[in-house]
Amino acid sequence: MNKEKVREYFLSKPGATEEKPFNIPVPVFKVGNKMFGLINIHEPDRPSINLKHPKDKIHELRSVFKDIKPGYHMNKDNWNTVYLDGDLEEDFIKELIDISYDLVFSSLPKKKQKEIMN
């Protein structure tokens, strides 16, 4: 899965927005003004994304899949870096994005969730 396909998938999520809030051109994807993913640029030859995952699953994902590592420049207890050029199938990468989105979306106030879904 390439970066452009990933970007399109991030933006297909309800209420998703793209920002570049840092001093470098890192695309950050948010829902309800909370980040659920970003596209890394630190390794130009190795495309990757950072995703938020549940604390009870984060270490399991890293131990089972060699292309999932602790989140680069992120809180390692909440974020994983997912490499796009390895053995992970496109559908599985989308599932990981869905998990991140759902985790962040569910943390939003109910009023904000309703606004996004309407």
What are these regions (language model features)?
Residues M1-N118:
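Charge-dense, helix-prone N-terminal extensions
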